[in-house]
Amino acid sequence: MSGRGKGGKVKGKSKSRSSRAGLQFPVGRIHRLLRKGNYAERVGAGAPVYLAAVMEYLAAEVLELAGNAARDNKKTRIVPRHLQLAIRNDEELNKLLSGVTIAQGGVLPNIQAVLLPKKTEKK
């Protein structure tokens, strides 16, 4: 007996951590950036996976709302204006990105109620 155990395990094709977690965002790159960014002395194995999942979810949410805004304006391409409309019309995203200025985003159309013409009753 040479002590090799039962059947040698052959390593198959390597699988990225992103694909293991079912994500599109790069877990390995986020892990590297967390280590290099002096955020903490050590970074756990689950932290970059969690962060990648959160970032992917937020990106998908913003893109879906911006796509809806583009479709409402009969456009096929998302431009900064559509991002602005999507974010500012969503209460939670607006709160999250309240301190963010989107270049070429414009403003939300809004007319104060006191500036609107008075409605007169006709008898």
UniProtKB/Swiss-Prot annotation:
Position of cross-link Glycyl lysine isopeptide (Lys-Gly) (interchain with G-Cter in ubiquitin)? 119
State the Gene Ontology BP annotations: defense response to bacterium
Domain of life according to the entry: Eukaryota
A GO CC annotation recorded here is: nucleosome
Residues bearing Phosphoserine are 2
Q: Gene3D superfamilies under this entry?
A: Histone, subunit A
Residue ranges of the region described as Disordered: 1-22
Q: Where is the composition biased (Basic residues)?
A: 1-18
Q: Which residues carry this modification: N5-methylglutamine?
A: 104
Q: Which InterPro entries match?
A: Histone-fold, Histone_H2A, Histone_H2A/H2B/H3, Histone_H2A_C, Histone_H2A_CS
Q: How is it modified after translation?
A: Monoubiquitination of Lys-119 gives a specific tag for epigenetic transcriptional repression. Phosphorylation of Ser-2 directly represses transcription.
* Positions of post-translational N-acetylserine modification: 2
Where located?
Answer: Nucleus; Chromosome
| GO MF entries | DNA binding; protein heterodimerization activity; structural constituent of chromatin
Q: Which UniProt keywords apply?
A: Acetylation, Antibiotic, Antimicrobial, Chromosome, DNA-binding, Isopeptide bond, Methylation, Nucleosome core, Nucleus, Phosphoprotein, Ubl conjugation
One Pfam family per UniProt: Histone_H2A_C
What this chain does, per the record? Core component of nucleosome. Nucleosomes wrap and compact DNA into chromatin, limiting DNA accessibility to the cellular machineries which require DNA as a template. Histones thereby play a central role in transcription regulation, DNA repair, DNA replication and chromosomal stability. DNA accessibility is regulated via a complex set of post-translational modifications of histones, also called histone code, and nucleosome remodeling.
The entry assigns this protein to a family as follows: Belongs to the histone H2A family.
The entry describes its oligomerization and partners as: The nucleosome is a histone octamer containing two molecules each of H2A, H2B, H3 and H4 assembled in one H3-H4 heterotetramer and two H2A-H2B heterodimers. The octamer wraps approximately 147 bp of DNA.
Q: Could you identify this protein by its name?
A: Histone H2A
Organism the protein comes from: Penaeus vannamei (Whiteleg shrimp)
